[in-house]
Curated annotation (Swiss-Prot):
Keywords: Glycoprotein, Signal. One of its GO terms (biological process) is response to virus. The keyword rRNA-binding does not apply. Belongs to the 7S seed storage protein family. Residues 64-223, 278-448 form the Cupin type-1 domain. Predominantly expressed in the embryo and endosperm of developing seeds. Also present in seedlings. InterPro entries: Cupin_1, RmlC-like_jellyroll, RmlC_Cupin_sf, Seed_Storage-Functional. This is Vicilin-like seed storage protein At3g22640. It holds the Pfam family Cupin_1.
Length: 486
């Protein structure tokens, strides 16, 4: 009899716990405000799990995505290339007016090549995507060279002559660069002391008499120096010998090495601080877990970036991961996909129709959009492509079927704040309970379930089956049996 009673009690307890456990995952209907009459149901998703298979596939034509064909070849030869995106305002004048003065480019140098000395009428920051090399900076008072490698961030100050050597014998040197012109918004020029196949020397802007007097040499010698490279058909990226590489790299130092103590003017110290490289991977990732890592150099922490208000970032995502939805308060990110493909989603107040060739403000009189609609921007972004994330726009990235690597330049990064909308640490879970009820029309328990169920911060698995449930949330049936006397 006693055993029968224990069994009955045990079964009742098990049934009660199971019912409570199931109810805890239900949406409590009475805590929702009743829908307004005429309210329509949202778009349905295709059936399927969260692992990437079955996700709703959609491709929209919008100005935030720049495919490989968007690049123009500024220079190309068998030794390497320089490819530049058009001005962002040429693509969408109204949308990208805030970043009109910024240009994005890619540089690739084949093994054992040399990018000839030149300077820009612009400031530039590049990230080394692949390979190793040496960069040397030269002024009329000082010169300094550095070894550079994958993950290095290098500032090239406006007007400072520099040249780059790919010291590797097998691997190309690849750079992603953001450039900030100082003369004409969105337009900059390279200035070369020596002529090449497609570039004139800036000495061509002076008369022979002036040059001969300035250098104190005969005009015949001057002519050979200025025009020789052009006559033999060499480009701005040239093949060099192992001995030349050894000579060019002989005095290069690692960015981590301290400068030798010597007397120098304060302005020279400032310049040397600006052009000293640093490595993103030497910085602890600001976001990191099993599903992704995010390294970021902020202008408040690096003198090289401070006056440009630019951040440099490197993101690594594993297959089947999600960079949780978030937005940047002031920063617009220009993002380059270094490897893999991913699904990019973003909320925007601007509407774009499939096949639309004109964006708001392009070729038409600008009119303020007072629409309250939010539109979904969706793209599959792949290796070699660029996408833009404007300030204030909530977005997310899903690496569904492969690992994903991207680098980014954050424009107007000073005093910008990144706010996550989902994850263990998120904006919505911090709302006052009363504000939550008024805003979303749900009770506190439902809000807590909605905004605190994610067990990961920053990066999360796309499959719900991979979501780890903390031990404290798991039902302990053994404790029930213990209570019943088994």
């Amino acid at each position: 009899m006693a055993i029968t009673n224990k069994l009955i009690i045990t079964l009742l307890l098990l049934i009660s716990i199971a019912v409570v456990h199931c109810l805890s995952f239900r949406v409590e209907i009475d805590e929702f405000e009743p829908p307004q009459q005429g309210e329509q149901e949202g778009p349905r998703r295709r059936p399927g799990g969260g692992s990437g298979e079955g996700w709703e596939e959609e491709s929209t034509n919008h100005p935030y995505h720049f495919r490989k064909r968007s690049f123009s070849d500024w220079f190309q030869s068998k030794e390497g290339f320089v490819r530049v995106l058009p001005k962002f305002t040429k693509h969408a004048p109204a949308l990208f007016r805030g970043i009109e003065n910024y240009r994005f480019s890619l540089v690739e140098m084949e093994p054992t090549t040399f990018f000839v000395p030149h300077h820009l009428d612009a400031d530039a920051v590049f990230i080394v995507l692949q390979g190793k090399g040496v960069i040397e900076f030269v002024t009329d008072k000082t010169k300094e060279s550095f070894h550079i490698t994958k993950g290095d961030v290098v500032r090239i100050p406006s007007g400072v002559t520099n040249f780059i050597t790919n010291t590797n014998q097998t691997v190309p040197l690849r750079l992603a660069q953001i450039t900030v012109p100082v003369n004409n918004p969105g337009n900059y020029k390279d200035y070369f002391p020596a002529a090449s196949q497609f570039q004139q020397s800036y000495f061509n802007g002076f008369t022979k008499e002036v040059l001969s007097t300035s250098f104190n040499v005969p005009e015949e010698l001057l002519g050979r120096l200025v025009t020789r490279s052009k006559e033999i058909g060499q480009g701005i990226i040239r093949r060099i010998s192992p001995d030349q590489i050894k000579e060019l790299a002989e005095h290069a130092t690692s960015p981590s090495n301290k400068h030798k103590a010597k007397k120098e003017k304060e302005e020279d110290k400032d310049l040397r601080t600006l052009w000293t490289p640093f490595n993103l991977f030497a910085i602890d990732p600001i976001y990191s877990n099993d599903f992704g890592h995010f390294h970021e150099a902020h202008p408040k922490n690096y003198n090289q970036l401070q006056d440009l208000h630019i951040a440099a970032a490197w993101a690594n995502m594993t297959q089947g991961s999600l960079f949780l939805p978030h937005f940047n308060s002031k920063t617009t990110f220009v993002t380059f996909v270094e490897n893999g493909c991913a699904r990019f989603e973003m909320a925007t107040p601007y509407k774009f129709q499939r096949g639309q060739q004109q964006w708001p403000g392009q070729g038409q009189e600008e009119e303020e959009d007072m629409s309250e609609n939010v539109h979904k921007v969706v793209s599959r972004v792949c290796k070699g492509e660029v996408f833009i994330v404007p300030a204030g726009h909530p977005f997310t990235i899903l690496s569904q079927d492969q690992d994903f690597i991207a680098v980014g330049f954050g424009i107007y990064a000073t005093n910008s704040k990144r706010t996550f909308l989902a994850g263990e640490e998120n904006l919505l879970s911090n709302l006052n309970p009363a504000a939550t009820r008024v805003t979303f029309g749900v009770g506190s328990k439902v809000a807590e379930k909605l905004f605190t169920s994610q067990n990961y911060s920053y990066f999360a698995p796309t499959s719900r089956s991979q979501q780890q449930i903390p031990e404290k949330h798991k039902p302990s049936f053994q404790s029930i049996l213990d209570f019943a006397g088994f």
